Amino acid sequence: IPKIENIRPQMKRIEIGADLNGSELAQVTRVLTTTSEVERFFEDLADSEIELLRLYQWQKQLVNLPELTRQLKTAIDEDGRVTDDASPELRTIRNNIRRSEQTIREQLDGLIRGGNAKYLSDTIVTMRNDRYVIPVKQEYRGVFGGVVHDQSASGQTLFIEPKQIVDSNNRLRSHQIAERSEIERILAELSAALVPHRRDILHNATVIGHLDFINGKA
């Protein structure tokens, strides 16, 4: 039986209308998944005509929630990240983000190659303030135009967002804001789906804990 976390605080929070984050939902998902696995294990024992009456008394208390389990496993991965499969809208937004990032990198790669290399401290693309920038030598700050987002400790390098990519960076930022909003909506929806089942889920966690304890003593 896998070790599961204490989910009592999470169940308390959804009871008062709070939303769980991805990591917290992943913890609840582990309880539900383990419930399903324990149920299958006991079904296999029954098929084998093996009787463990003491354990069956605990198993009978489990409430399997297959549809809720499937919904959570589809939307939240084991690390608590909201997956692309969580909603068609999120998949579309993330595809837009990937395309925007690819476009920006291609634009910047074109800028830092060839003759422009002499204006740069290094021919790399990096990030400042969630914007793609390039490291430009202080004395050439006017070559690329655009926005200065940061400078090196020595002041010899400026991290500049060239004017050619400002619009692309703005589009990317817009997609990222949309992604965050959709993730918040999904987390709220999943948290709300748990509310009617919170007592069953909490009791399942207690039963699994007892079974794990008994297994440890065996």
Name every feature range the model reports, one short phrase each:
Residues 91-140:
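Extended, Lys/Arg-enriched charged tracts that mediate electrostatic binding to polyanionic substrates
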Residues 64-77, 167-188:
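Extended, charged coiled-coil "arm/hinge" scaffolds of SMC/Rad50-like chromosome-maintenance ATPases
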Residues 1-89, 93, 197-200, 204-218:
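Conserved amphipathic alpha-helical "coupling/scaffold" segments
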Residues 43, 108, 112-115, 183, ...:
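Coiled-coil heptad-register positions
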Residues 79, 86-100, 168, 175, ...:
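Long, non-membrane, amphipathic alpha-helices that form coiled-coils
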Residues 177-210:
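Non-transmembrane, heptad-repeat alpha-helical coiled-coil rod segments
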Residues 24, 82, 86-89, 93, ...:
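Surface positions of alpha-helical coiled-coils, especially the charged/polar e/g heptad sites
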Residues 124, 128-162, 169:
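SMC-family hinge/dimerization module
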